[in-house]
Amino acid sequence: MTPNAALRNADSVKKALLGLSTAEIAGILPDAPAYTAKQIRAFCFAGKEIPDMTSVSAERRTALREAGYVANPVTVERVYASRDGSKKYLFRMRDGNLVEGVFMPHDYGASLCVSTQVGCRMGCAFCASGKDGLVRNLDFSEILGQVVAVNASEGGTVKNRAVVNVVLMGSGEPLDNYDNVARFLAEVSAADGLNISERNISLSTSGLVDGIRRLADSGSKVTLSISLHSPFDEERKKIMPVAKKYSVAELTDAAKYYFTVTGRRVIFEYTLIKGVNDSDACAKRLHELTRGFPCHINLIRLNEVKGSGLERPRADAADAFLKKLLDMGVSATLRRSFGEDIAGACGQLRRRVIDEETAAERAAAKSGADGRNAKTTVEKGGASKPAKHTDRSKFTTV
């Protein structure tokens, strides 16, 4: 049987090679030598597409392409470069959907924030990701594809990675897409993959208590970041609908369980919102909740989202709140905001580009004009142009 014939008869629904095991790849090319599957897997993690896998026979590369396979199901649509050195990546999925990532350089190694869902069902008042609700979960290969694409784009290799740390804090709730996130964690940390230790990975959750306990029981060693944002149940319910299901007490109990099982210190994310959660009473309650528990509070000033009605506190007010915590002996820091000049907060860039593309579609429909086709370039403080015209009939705007 020829490679083409074998592929035509294969169950190839996913059509993405990235993250498949050598056994899974071998099943796609059953007549290939055993080493071919290992080569293909290595090429995928190196950010190579099928035509660039030159040590694989031309016949098999053609067979893969004709069967509709790609190495990475994610393409870089645009790149925005910020004055602070960070970069906002806009990724397009094969079905046309968009998600975001942020590349953040640090002295201790660059971090990449990736998305786990298109949109989000959590509906947090201060987050642009959930304004349109959940569109769909990302497949594990699409989460992995963001890391591989940026690592290659930033000049990294498998052995000398540009991406040192990964943060699951982009669009979506990771624990609402648990199975795909678990497979992603296994693949991104695999010795024959990117080999990023789970200790270099942070997972941020809005507070799905059952998911936190499941993650702890899985043997995970990732750093757990919990979006707290208010120490009071009634106030938290106003800005985070998930609080209607899980109380602050249940959430802190789950955090303590995660620490007990994994030995990993838990981070509480706390977005400072003017007049909402920056009072003396909030600081005192945070001290009470975290007393005697190895954890850390990560403060960040709100990135304002249009239409939310929520305001960002002044820098001196944020500093004062931090001082209150420190004076009470609470482990806390005020985190730097990355990419403020390039819509760096969750969902802001995706929302803006969807609006731009929708407006362009309407204009094109009105004038009968075709979409434009341009090469992707990086522009400081601004956007690159789309790499290609995409069939927007498959693009979900919700």
Question: Where does each model-flagged region fall?
Answer:
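Short linear Ser/Thr-Pro motifs
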Residues: 81-82, 115-116, 129, 204, ...
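Conserved AdoMet/S-adenosylmethionine-binding subsite of the radical SAM
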Residues: 151-330
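Exposed loop/turn and edge beta-strand positions of beta-sandwich/beta-sheet ligand-binding modules
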Residues: 85, 110, 162
